[in-house]
Amino acid sequence: MLPEMTDEQRAAALARAGEARRKRAEIKHLLKSGSLTFSDVLERAESDDLVAGAKVAAIVAAMPGMGKVSTERLLSEIGIADGRTLRGLGKNQKELLVERFS
């Protein structure tokens, strides 16, 4: 069961969630436009919890030339689960993804 929240707590949680969505959408837009590299996103994830919580599949799908099928195929090849976040990637998985998008 979820804990009861006061109106102020609920408003603060909604604001945090909105900020996370905006930041992740901005990252995906910058990736799609080529203004940001996959390595840049991994660097940001080390210092920014909102970026670190982004799903790997969503970030990979935002890369130029990547769609739903090619993203699923790549993540399967590397051994990355669908729900994995950037924070949860292992060293080898990061290296393989950076190599793929270099």
Residue ranges, per PLM feature:
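Generic beta-strand or strand-like secondary-structure segments
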Residues: 26, 70-73, 96
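Accessory alpha-helical DNA-binding modules that contact the DNA backbone or grooves
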Residues: 76-102
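Alpha-helix boundary/capping and short turn/kink residues
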Residues: 47-50, 65-68, 80-83, 91
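Helix-hairpin-helix
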Residues: 59-75, 90
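Long, highly charged, low-complexity intrinsically disordered interaction regions
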Residues: 2-63
